[in-house]
């Protein structure tokens, strides 16, 4: 359930785009009703409408977490800021390039924060999260942390490659299924590599 909740804005973005893609004219009409303007290029209506929805969904997600748990994770705030800024630029300039950059910036913010924590603060964020569940040698914790940094850097670059070398609908598919699929494969791979340490501990 938590995974679905975390993916809630992305799922709505995907669903809105796919629905609006079938009738750009209707999407443009909804844009006029919601924001008071119709896109200059009707072909952009699906991605612009999906951008409006993902901004609203992310705001709703923050509000729900705040009232349900009282505390909102910092990275969720970062995601909100990025989607509002890049989504707002997308709508203001009617240019989908801005919203396509958003996932990359988010991935690289994750990587940058982990680099800062590891090399400046001398703290391992992965160990801080999983240290109570796993007992690993320090060099292994370091490798796990570096692997996550590398993964986020790679995902950011891959998002740009897909976003600007393939049609928008391909990028929208990748944003949900590609990103989630690669994350799942990576996490499973990490689990397999770390399982031997869990067995040794037993």
Swiss-Prot record:
It is found in: Cell inner membrane. The chain crosses the membrane at residues 47-67, 75-95, 101-121, 146-166, 174-194. InterPro entries: YciB. It comes from the Bacteria. Keywords: Cell inner membrane, Cell membrane, Membrane, Transmembrane, Transmembrane helix. It is a multi-pass membrane protein. One of its GO terms (cellular component) is plasma membrane. Plays a role in cell envelope biogenesis, maintenance of cell envelope integrity and membrane homeostasis. PANTHER family: INNER MEMBRANE-SPANNING PROTEIN YCIB (PTHR36917:SF1), INTRACELLULAR SEPTATION PROTEIN A-RELATED (PTHR36917). Belongs to the YciB family. This is Inner membrane-spanning protein YciB. It comes from Dechloromonas aromatica (strain RCB). The gene is yciB.
């Amino acid at each position: 359930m938590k995974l679905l909740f975390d993916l809630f804005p992305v799922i709505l973005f995907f669903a809105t785009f796919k629905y609006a893609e079938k009738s750009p004219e209707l999407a443009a009409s909804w844009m006029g009703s919601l924001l008071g303007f119709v896109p200059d290029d009707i072909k952009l209506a699906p991605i612009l409408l999906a951008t409006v929805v993902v901004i609203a969904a992310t705001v709703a997600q923050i509000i729900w977490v705040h009232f349900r748990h009282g505390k909102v994770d910092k990275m969720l705030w970062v995601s909100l800021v990025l989607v509002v800024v890049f989504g707002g630029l997308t709508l203001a300039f009617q240019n989908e390039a801005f919203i396509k950059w958003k996932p990359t910036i988010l991935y690289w913010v994750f990587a940058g924060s982990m680099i800062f924590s590891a090399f400046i603060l001398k703290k391992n964020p992965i160990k801080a999260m999983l240290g109570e569940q796993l007992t690993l040698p320090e060099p292994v914790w370091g490798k796990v942390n570096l692997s996550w940094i590398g993964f986020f850097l790679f995902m950011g670059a891959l998002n740009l490659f897909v976003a600007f070398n393939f049609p928008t609908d391909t990028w929208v598919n990748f944003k949900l299924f590609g990103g989630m699929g690669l994350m799942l494969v990576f996490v499973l791979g990490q689990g397999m590599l770390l399982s031997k340490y869990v067995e040794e501990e037993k």
